[in-house]
Curated annotation (Swiss-Prot):
NCBIfam families: kdsB (TIGR00466), PRK05450.1-3 (NF003950), PRK05450.1-5 (NF003952), PRK13368.1 (NF009905). This is 3-deoxy-manno-octulosonate cytidylyltransferase. It holds the Pfam family CTP_transf_3. The keyword Cell wall biogenesis/degradation does not apply.
């Protein structure tokens, strides 16, 4: 199938300055992400950035395109919408948003989310999830949960523990870490969109829920659009947010 990968890459990061240009065994992090995207068979890979230093760091890569975008975007999705405009992408083009801090993302996951959207015409967006397997993630606000309807359309995404098991999630069980979390799904932050929807997304007002939870996908649900969620065929390793994360990736690639 045909799809395009867009990788938003902001230079400034609160916890890791110049994060896209961090060295990982002789390659920048953003270059490693583009390599994984190319392995997916995408017909085009575009890095969307707001900083000339990232443009310069990628000049030697002939297989990808780099798009300079505005520094004023509120989210990575808004940045994707600008890419659609600059490249004049056809309305039915499928765009996969790959995070710029995931140098180990499996190419199969990129293919899966693109296929997911292609096969679900009622959805404006497709994304992935995975069963929560660690009790530490049940009440971890950084592990975003998703609840779906019977057709695997998202009902809600939250940093809170949803669905809440009224009978099992007692204070005692929480303290003993003996809660039953088999019904919980963790959201995996990869998305597929049609270019037509990205253009529409850029015109949508920011939703109160999005501001409250700091989850941009809630803008989609707030405005009445559907997000299809499928369980990932392979669980992507966590992205890089801290120096410890960076070392973990380096250790993984060294073995």
């Amino acid at each position: 199938m045909s799809f395009i990968v867009v990788i938003p890459a902001r230079y400034h990061s609160t916890r890791l300055p110049a994060k896209p240009l961090l060295d990982i065994l002789g390659q920048t992090m953003i270059e490693r992400v583009t390599n994984q995207a190319l392995k997916s068979g995408a017909k085009q890979v575009i890095v969307a950035t707001d900083d000339q230093r990232i443009v310069d760091a990628l000049k030697h890569l002939n297989e990808i395109d780099v798009c300079m975008t505005s520094k004023d975007h509120q989210s990575g999705t808004d940045r994707l919408a600008e890419v659609c405009q600059q490249f004049k992408l056809a309305d039915d083009e499928i765009i996969v948003n790959v995070q710029g801090d995931e140098p180990l993302i499996p190419p199969s996951v990129i293919i899966q989310v693109a296929t997911n959207l292609q096969q679900n015409s009622a959805a404006s967006v497709a994304t992935l999830s995975a069963p929560i397997e660690d009790v530490a993630d049940v009440f971890n606000t950084n592990a975003v949960k998703v609840v779906c309807d019977k057709n695997n359309m998202a009902l809600y995404f939250s940093r809170a523990t949803i669905p809440w098991n009224r009978d099992d999630f007692s204070v005692e069980n929480q303290a003993e870490k003996s809660v039953d979390f088999t019904a919980l799904q963790r959201h995996i932050g990869i998305y597929a969109y049609r270019a037509s929807f990205l253009r529409q997304y850029a015109t949508l007002s920011v939703s109160p829920l999005e501001l409250l939870e700091k989850l941009e996908q809630l803008r989609v649900l707030w405005h009445g659009f559907k997000i299809h969620v499928e369980q990932a065929n392979k669980i992507p390793p966590p992205g890089i947010d801290t120096q410890d994360d960076l070392q973990r990736v380096i250790d993984c690639l060294s073995h």
